[in-house]
Regions:
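Membrane-embedded beta-barrel scaffold of Gram-negative outer-membrane proteins
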Residues: 166-167, 445-470, 678-694, 708-796, ...
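Short, acidic, small-residue-rich periplasmic hinge/interaction motif at the N-terminus
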Residues: 39-69, 91-93, 149-194
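N-terminal periplasmic accessory domains that precede
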Residues: 147-148, 201, 223-225, 245, ...
Length: 968
């Protein structure tokens, strides 16, 4: 039995133990009873969060000085019996039972509730309890009258240290303060994103604890991972465990969701299972992007221009136009272009001992030298968005946005680590990388707000088209190979209906229903070069086929569908003034189908596997259009039989054949739930405890195979606190997640010579790990140290491993080289991965930033330093680290860190200047200032310094100018 379960030695750093101890100490402050007894009177209260804006129209000054009250009246106790009810009617009951008149504000009384008030109390004691936490105060005018008024704000000292700003989010489906929301959530507005120099979602990887986001070469997709769990399958029907929503609309494909960040209102990243409200495929978390909506009362806009190295050019802007008092428009757009981070070479000769000039194994075919802008890692993308807001009445509003995104970059490249270590960021490519992706999205939200409830409808529709070429062998193989998305089309639509009651009710409920449909079609091809390496007349690479678009292997998926239906509800009940209980549940019905999907091979090799010269097969393999050229061919494809459509001489009578028939339809059902208790002993401190379950849809794949859904049960406790007079914010969460049928992908085995022995690696397949356990601690700190100094810290300490995970040996008895051929391995001899760590899960990772404002008469100069540090992590499920000498001829001395990224530190620097009383700002930004080489994903080709890998961007810098304007 093969084993690959090596683990790094040592436990978590001391910082983890100290942080956990601090966490437990804080949590121990919770009293065992949440009732206050005063003179034998038990007061059970409920707390309500009321935004300050709701009381602006009320008086903010106290009435005339009160008349003296008789001592007898002041000490007189009254037997009060006031049930829980709105504050307005509660004060009426108080007035009747105390025989006293109430004078003052009434506008906001309905927005608060009183809890049960029983027992013998003085009038003052009763009023203290009734008005606690409402922002209201009172003054006794005389024995028979009392005045209720809004507390006057305390004037701020001119030189007082600034306070942390309140952050309003909608993580619970309602607008709440971040610090009063019992969820592990991080939130950022556009100002914070600009301050960090963020241009796309990947920047959040160092701003959110436990979040990893990186691009990958195939499929132009982004790998999103939260709390140690992500998706390595990026095909046309794959699902990830981190859902992405834009303006409340679910985005099923990461290629369509991870676009440019511009004109953003806020981003909320929710950690842990969020399936109750966020729906399918949010078993480890949810990322929610909310763009700016039109304003109805002001003409305003912004513009920014940035220039940097690698000929970086970045433009962003937005314009808000109120057409009338009830209708407004907003237009925003962004572009980003830069040259390639990676150089293209003719061949690897002369670059070192691993690449000798005489090596047939590592010498590539000659290639066309003029690639223009098609070199790896260049960027050419733009996006625009037109949105409207119609608000004819105070009760109804309609928000609509139309967005288009296009990416014409060149994709990524997998680089040889030994070359990167020498400062050579270069690759040999037999085919220039190519990408053309467009995504068009329509989003609509309708809201109707009645007196006691709000009804919302959300509709989304999108279409994504993509063509792409990826060099599969990086020029390292004499059997040139490229992966080509000949065509693809992804159509998605969704409907969601939500009904919720008023925010001021003691029992707050939310009901909803969701339905979505996705239809995808794709033609994916694998091309190979002529065995002799001939070129066409124009110098371009010569293919086996003379037909444009022809290939040696196709995955033709004309109709892959996903349908999802969900019903959900969430209830929150205020137990008393200090604590509340939340329960939620969601029913999900997911259906996936493949109609007419076929994997087709066209013979370009002999039965023994040697390559056939181009002259022996005539015109060569057919193009996808040729394959479907006539009814007989279509009938053969549908039947899954061998066929010859007459476009090739072939070898024998069968130039092309169907390798796999993919027809399948399967449905999964799930009920996921949420139980949460939160306790707030003061306005500055909250604790919460949560038990939640999550569900990630099952997966269908080629040959009619499928894997089970992924489920998780998560246990979590957390706290949110503000100290130092609201100048220091500290939030933390401790979690333990048990996963069943955790989904991971690896390469399948193929039998290409029909001898019954699997002899080469093949397409990526998804498999279920029986079980996995992930636990960790997350901390976020935001500290206004002085009036000119500010610091932020995010930290994640994670321990993750597979409890039970065995897979077929797709590596042919060798854990370090997936492409070793001609070795027979029994299916009963699996690779045991139990105890291994999932990819890209460091034991700890933190980001520390510090900024200082130098204040001058003419403006403010702000330097900022950001330190990012991470422990080491593996890049694949095999946890491949050290290779002993003598195993492979190509690596006689062995190797180390084959599939590992060592621990590292990164440094980002910025300097910005904002003039006083002006609407412009200029800033300089440097990312990865020390130019560190950081692996984010791995491939399969082997070098002495490790497997080929995708790397983080090198050092980049830019100068950026921003301007804000409005009609005032």
């Amino acid at each position: 039995m093969n084993k690959s379960n090596k683990k790094r030695e040592g436990g978590l750093p001391t910082a983890v133990v100290l942080a956990a101890a601090s966490f437990a100490l804080n949590f121990g402050l919770i009293p065992q009873a949440i009732a206050a007894t005063i003179g034998g009177t038990v007061i059970e209260d409920t707390i309500e969060d009321t935004p300050e804006s709701t009381i602006e129209s009320t008086p903010k000054t106290s009435p005339k000085k009160a008349t003296k009250i008789s001592p007898q009246s002041a000490q007189l106790t009254i037997a009060f019996n006031i049930p829980s009810q709105p504050l307005e009617s509660g004060l009426v009951a108080f007035s009747q039972q105390a025989d006293i008149n109430i004078i003052g504000v009434t506008a906001i009384l309905r927005e608060h509730r009183v809890a049960v008030l029983k027992g013998d109390l003085t009038k003052a004691e009763a009023l203290d309890r009734l008005l606690q936490g409402t922002g209201l105060s009172y003054e006794m005018i005389n024995d028979t009258a009392v005045s209720i008024f809004v507390k006057a704000p305390v004037p701020e000292a001119p030189d007082e240290v600034p306070l942390l700003q309140e952050i309003i989010i909608t993580a619970t489906g309602r607008a709440t303060d971040l610090q009063k929301t019992p969820i592990a959530v991080s939130a950022f507005d556009q100002t914070r994103l600009d301050f960090a120099g963020a241009t796309d979602l990947r920047a959040l990887s160092y701003m959110v604890p436990g979040l990893e986001m990186t691009n990958t070469a195939p499929q132009a997709a982004t790998l999103v991972q939260l709390r140690g769990v992500g998706s390595t399958n990026i095909t046309e029907i794959a699902d990830g465990p981190v859902s992405i929503h834009v303006d409340g609309i679910y985005s099923p494909r990461s290629q369509a969701a991870v676009t440019l960040l511009y004109d953003v209102d806020r981003i909320e990243v929710l950690r842990g299972p969020q399936g109750t409200l966020r729906g399918r495929n949010s078993s480890s978390g949810s990322i929610n992007i909310y763009n700016q909506q039109p304003l109805l009362d002001v003409v305003e806009g912004n513009l920014s221009v940035g220039y940097g190295n690698y000929d970086r050019r970045e433009y962003r802007g937005a314009l808000n136009l109120p057409v009338s008092d009830t209708f407004g428009l907003r237009f925003a757009g962004a572009t980003l272009r830069h040259d390639a981070y990676t150089d293209l070479l003719d061949n690897y000769q002369g670059l070192g001992p691993d690449y000798p000039a005489t090596s047939d194994e590592l010498t590539a075919f000659d290639q066309a030298l003029d690639y223009g802008q098609s070199a790896p890692e260049m960027a050419d993308k733009y996006s625009w968005r037109l949105s409207s807001l119609w608000q004819p009445t105070e009760q109804f509003s309609a928000f609509t946005s139309l967005e288009r995104y296009r990416d014409q970059g060149a994709g990524l490249a997998q680089l040889a680590p030994d070359l990167v270590a020498k400062g050579i960021r270069a690759v040999v490519s037999d085919s220039p990388s190519f990408l053309d992706l467009t995504n068009t999205v329509l989003r609509t939200k309708l809201d109707y707000r009645a007196t006691d409830f709000t009804l919302s409808y959300l509709y989304g529709k999108s279409q994504m088209d993509r063509q792409q070429i990826v060099d599969a062998d990086n020029g390292r193989s004499s059997s040139f190979e490229q992966q080509r998305t000949h065509s693809s089309n992804f159509k998605f639509s969704s409907h969601e209906l939500q009904l919720m009651n008023d925010d001021t009710e003691r029992l707050r409920w939310l009901l909803g229903g969701f339905f979505s449909r996705e239809k995808n079609e794709i033609v994916f091809a694998v091309d190979q070069q002529n065995a002799g390496g001939e070129r066409n007349a124009d110098g371009a690479t010569s293919w086996i086929s003379d037909f444009e678009g022809a290939a040696v292997s196709y995955a033709i998926q004309p109709d892959r569908r996903v349908e999802s239906m969900g019903l959900f509800s969430q209830l929150t009940y205020d137990l008393d003034r200090f604590s509340r209980f939340t329960v939620g549940a969601r029913y999900t019905n997911d259906s996936k189908s493949d109609r007419g999907g076929r994997a087709i091979n066209c013979r370009v090799t002999s039965v023994l596997g040697s390559y056939v010269g181009p002259d022996s097969i005539g015109p060569g393999a057919p193009s996808p259009e040729d394959i479907y050229a006539d009814a007989a061919t279509q009938q053969a494809i549908n039947a899954g039989s061998f066929h010859d459509n007459g476009t090739s001489e072939g070898i024998g009578d069968q130039p092309c054949w169907i390798r796999q028939v993919n027809d399948l339809k399967i449905t999964w059902e799930n009920v996921s739930g949420l139980l949460r208790y939160d306790y707030r002993p003061s306005d500055d401190l909250m604790y919460f405890a949560t038990v939640s379950t999550g569900f990630k849809s099952g997966h269908i794949q080629d040959a009619g195979n499928h894997v089970a859904p992924e489920t998780v049960t998560n246990f979590e406790v957390g706290f949110k606190a503000q100290y130092l007079d609201d100048r220091l914010r500290l939030n933390g969460a401790l979690f333990h997640a048990n996963y069943n049928d955790l989904q991971f992908s690896n390469e399948d085995r193929l039998d290409i010579n029909f001898d019954g022995i699997a002899d080469t690696g093949g397409s990526t397949v998804v498999r279920n790990a029986s079980a996995a356990t992930i636990q960790g601690l997350e901390l976020e700190l935001d500290w206004v140290m002085t009036d000119v100094d500010q610091m932020q810290l995010t930290a994640a300490f994670t321990h993750a491993h597979f409890d039970q995970f065995e897979i077929p040996d797709t590596l042919f008895g060798d854990l370090f080289n997936p492409y070793v051929s001609n070795q027979s391995v029994s299916p009963e001899d699996p690779v045991v991965l139990s105890g291994n760590s999932p990819p890209r899960v460091p034991d700890w990772k933190l980001t520390l930033s510090y900024s200082h404002n130098f204040i001058f008469d003419r403006g403010v100069l702000t330097p900022r330093v950001v330190l990012k540090a991470s422990d080491s992590y593996y890049l694949d499920i095999y946890n491949r680290d050290t290779l002993a000498p003598g195993i492979f001829d190509s690596l006689p001395n062995g190797g180390s860190d084959l599939g590992v990224q060592k621990s590292y530190q990164l440094l980002d620097l910025s300097l910005s200047y904002k003039p006083a009383a002006k609407n412009w700002m200029v800033g300089a930004y440097i990312h990865n200032a020390a130019n560190k080489d950081i692996k984010v994903d791995s491939g399969n080709a082997l070098s002495s310094a490790g497997l080929v890998a995708t790397y983080m961007e090198p050092r980049t810098y830019q100068l950026k100018f921003s301007y804000l304007f409005d009609e005032n």
